[in-house]
Design a protein with these regions (language model features):
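Residue-level signal for beta-strand positions within conserved beta-sheet cores that form or flank
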Residues: 26, 59, 135
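Short, internal strand/loop/helix patches
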Residues: 50-93
């Protein structure tokens, strides 16, 4: 949801892009999922998603358009950004917030515990994820139903 200030915090500070580049360089497939319904805040069609990625210099492996919310509901995504890490064996290894400070202030990024980064490193190192579930924060996903 490009209109969400919590998403803006991480893209505006280049935090999301750094995470995307680090992860994909390590062989991770990073999927950005847009589950907002047409006419709702955060909705983007393919052309708009491409424009947003270019504008923000985003580096996901791919963007999945989910206007019916099927994938979002499958993973119980409630807010944006709501982060998920799926291990190489296909099991859900992490779900929750990108970090520990639920604010829209970019200055808080360096002070926060980087939940997602830690989970990615632990999965890549073949270790259990210490905090496999954390509280996500952000704007609610605007589902069709």
């Amino acid at each position: 949801n490009a209109e969400c200030p919590y998403v803006g915090k991480h893209y505006g500070a280049d935090n999301m892009q750094k995470l995307q580049r680090e992860a994909t360089a390590a062989g991770v497939v990073w999927l950005s999922v847009i589950s907002s319904a047409p006419g709702e805040q955060g909705y983007a069609d393919a052309k708009e998603a491409e424009r947003l990625n270019a504008e923000r210099k985003a580096a996901p492996s791919a963007v999945l358009l989910d206007p019916e919310g099927k994938l979002g509901h499958l993973y119980d995504a409630r807010v944006t950004p709501h982060m998920f890490v799926i291990g190489p064996d296909g099991t859900l290894r992490y779900m929750g917030g990108i970090d520990s400070i639920p604010s829209a202030r970019a200055a808080d990024i360096d002070k926060a515990e980087p939940y997602l980064r830690n989970a990615l490193h632990q999965v890549l190192d073949g270790q259990p994820v210490e905090k496999a579930v954390t509280r996500p924060y952000g704007c609610t996903v605007k589902y069709a139903s």
